[in-house]
Amino acid sequence: YYSILLNPTDEGPFNPFSIREIRYAVNFLVDRDLIVNELLGGFGTSMFSNYGSFSAEYLRVLDVIETFQFRYNPSFAEKVITDELEIRGAEKIDGVWNYENEPIEITFFIRSDDPVRKAIGEILSSELEEIGFVVKKEFGDLNKAYVVVYGSNPAEQKWSLYTEGWGSSGFTRYDSVALAQMYSPWFSSMPGNNNPSNWNYENDK
């Protein structure tokens, strides 16, 4: 499985991904059909949550997934991002978003040891640059990712996005683990890793 992990910290310099609506908008910048058909040669299927269409749990969450209407729609993504940034006082100057007179720069950690993830990172970087962000691309393997992404305090903002990859070991009905693993901070796999010395993501109550 392939996914994009975002750093949602609201500490430190202005971070556009601290804004929930902008994180949501990123879903519409990902051309899943392109990834499946071109990068995977048709050997895959689009996913919109951690439960794919072949998961035993998929039918239980399908009605919720369909309400989001996720699809490749960069115009919609740009509108959402523009609205949210302008509300917070950002302005676009010569095609680049600025906040408090500084360009908004994001760091995209892209796995260079996996050609599929490298391509996904390059494509999404172009989409984000088209929106008006300054994208700093940092390439590395899993060892480097353990240090930069999983081993750092999100508040340090050493990364903004990461081309994540993961796998499933079985076909499980009533999966009690995957939901917590992907969406709960107490499982210790969210940004911050539940380390009390780090900034940690918390679900809205």
Regions found by a protein language model. Name each.
Residues 1-22, 29, 38-39, 202:
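A bilobed periplasmic-binding-protein/Venus flytrap-type ligand-binding module shared by bacterial periplasmic
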Residues 2, 159-179:
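Ligand-binding clamshell of periplasmic/extracellular solute-binding protein-like
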Residues 24, 36-39, 70, 136-146, ...:
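Extracytoplasmic/peripheral linker and loop segments enriched in polar/acidic and small residues
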Residues 4, 13-16, 116-119, 145-148, ...:
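Extracytoplasmic/secreted cell-surface and envelope-processing proteins
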Residues 21, 122-131, 144-159:
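Short helices/loops that flank or line small-molecule/ion binding pockets
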Residues 8-10, 30, 43, 55, ...:
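Short, flexible loop/turn elements at secondary-structure junctions
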Residues 3, 24, 106-107, 134-136, ...:
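Beta-sheet entry/capping signal
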Residues 18-126, 130:
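Append "and occasionally in soluble cytosolic enzymes with long acidic Gly/Pro-rich linkers
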